[in-house]
């Protein structure tokens, strides 16, 4: 199937850039905004991102360039072998001179590679949450991983009880949004950096848990930990969520902008009149992936947006794309 994909910019905080710059023997002040870039075919999962995964032996370039949409100065990190997929060789500056200015619409984007590191050298660096709609949270107790209970014990101010008074949860924002290692990362496509959303994939869940990364769950009115997308294929509405969880972990304005939106048109009742899926109409209409990508472009967090043909699992009975 053909989907709208995005290569997202995950901003690197100043303190982590200084660590990265020291490893790469670069100035403490980055050229423009420093970012890790990661590609995804499912932009609707980006609000649930909690980590970025790199291959331990893969080489990664640090590149000074511009955002092709708004010409913002950027310092990017991506796999060395994937640079040519995003930046034309005609734009590379190799003589050590200053990058020429860039304006949107120019034939190519100027860039230069200033350093190269392995994935292992990137491990542990942090980045800013791309879409700070919801803070990561975990349920504490006997069945919780040790790192969750240890964190809750060390940070009692982060612990809260569900509105039904039964279960206790801990907000774990500080433990997420960092670079982790994964042997399954490849450089066949994308940037060589994988966006990790544990609630939407078994591989993501395993690599995150192995690295003590908390998941980004929502907590329902019933006190259940749930992915951001419900079983009808839409983002949960705020009134379906535990009030104490919302108070502790949800940016109501940011999340509320898309609360209740269907992540695939195939599940939207508008395209299922009388329970019959109008496949042609749903595929023709703009879907949430496109909306999210356009919002990212306006916010300056999208480095590349394009259509991509790929294999995606579908239900054999309804022919609809599978979400879980």
Task: Label each residue range with its predicted role.
Residues 3-7:
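A contiguous, basic/glycine-rich beta-loop/short-helix subdomain that forms a polymer-engagement track
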Residues 1-2, 31:
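Short, ordered beta-strand-loop transition motifs
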Residues 16-36, 43-324:
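Non-cofactor substrate-recognition interfaces
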């Amino acid at each position: 199937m053909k989907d709208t994909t995005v290569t997202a910019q995950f901003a690197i905080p100043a303190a982590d850039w200084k660590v990265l710059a020291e490893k790469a023997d670069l100035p403490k002040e980055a050229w423009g905004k420093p970012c890790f870039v990661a590609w995804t075919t499912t932009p609707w999962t980006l609000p649930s991102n909690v980590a970025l995964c790199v291959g331990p032996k893969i080489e990664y370039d640090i590149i000074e360039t511009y955002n092709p949409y708004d010409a913002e100065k950027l310092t990017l990190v991506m796999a060395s072998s994937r640079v040519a997929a995003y930046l034309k060789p005609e734009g590379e500056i190799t003589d050590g001179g200053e990058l020429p200015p860039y304006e949107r619409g120019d034939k190519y984007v100027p860039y230069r590679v200033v350093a190269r590191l392995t994935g292992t050298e990137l491990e542990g660096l942090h980045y800013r949450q791309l879409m700070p709609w919801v803070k990561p949270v975990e349920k504490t107790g006997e069945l919780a991983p040790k790192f969750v209970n240890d964190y809750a014990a060390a940070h009692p101010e982060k612990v809260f009880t569900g509105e039904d008074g039964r279960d206790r949860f801990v907000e774990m924002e500080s433990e997420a949004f960092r670079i982790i290692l994964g042997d399954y990362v490849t450089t066949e496509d994308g940037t060589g950096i994988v966006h990790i959303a544990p609630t939407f994939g078994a591989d993501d869940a395993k690599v995150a848990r192995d690295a003590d990364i908390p998941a980004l769950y929502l907590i329902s009115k019933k006190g259940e930990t749930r992915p951001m997308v419900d079983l009808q294929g839409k983002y949960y509405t705020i009134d379906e969520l535990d009030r104490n969880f919302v108070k502790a972990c949800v940016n109501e304005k940011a999340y509320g902008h898309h609360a209740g939106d269907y992540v695939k048109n195939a599940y939207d009742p508008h395209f299922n009149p009388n329970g019959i899926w109008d496949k042609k109409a749903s595929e023709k209409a703009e879907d949430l992936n496109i909306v999210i990508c356009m919002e990212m472009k306006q916010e300056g967090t999208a480095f590349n947006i394009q259509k991509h043909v790929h294999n995606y699992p579908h239900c054999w009975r309804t022919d609809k794309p599978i979400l879980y």
